[in-house]
Amino acid sequence: MHEVSDIKVASGVIPIQNQHPMLMAQRALTLNQIAGGRFTLGVGVTHRAVTEGMWGISWDRSVRRLSEYLDGLLPLLAGEQVNATGEMLTTRGALQIPDVRTPEVYVAALGPQMLRLTGRRTAGTITWMTGPKTLKEHIGPTMRTAAAEAGRPDGAVKVAAALPVAVTDDVTAVRSLAAEQFAMYGHLPSYRAMLDREGYAGPEDAALIGDEATVRERLDEVRTAGVDEFVAIPFDPSAEGQDRTRTCLRSLASQ
């Protein structure tokens, strides 16, 4: 980060249930200080199978939980004293981390209530397994309408869309790889809902797979669906697949 001035770094999506807003803010501010103000924090409520099955923490009322989490997190990131007492979460105090910018916060919002909360209060949403039709007709409009109704200016919120990408001539084999590698997402309710909205049978349909021309065409569909930032997840483990995919993505990024 110190050697390259134009690269940003983001956390991906960090679950909120297993760390308090004070700890999350402390980590985010420290990272942003190290990154020279180029760090973006992503948060989300993860899935019932994770919170209840792995951690023994209730997943119920997840929208309320996230709202109260932001009540504590956002002021702390801005260097402010916070005194937020909610039904599910309490955050009181302040952090003493001088000379650090407030990092942007993105939320992994897919459903309408989460998107509206995101539009009102944060920098945007990070999507996964969400195709261009759903991005254009559901994700962007729901979030941006909520932002406008909250009095926020145009461009206040952004859509960052993440999808698997593989440039290959062996489409059948790589689709099978995608179906196997990303199978779990077809069974998690939030992602399953996005796949169903798009008319996709499974995660392999959401993945951008094909030769350079095909991948460029599908990426253009995503770009014109109101996406501000695209997060490519190369997944073909072969050396040729990795090289072709990264070369294609670099050429598109430079345009």
What feature does the model see in each segment?
Residues 1-255:
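Active-site-adjacent structural elements that line small-molecule/cofactor binding pockets in enzymes
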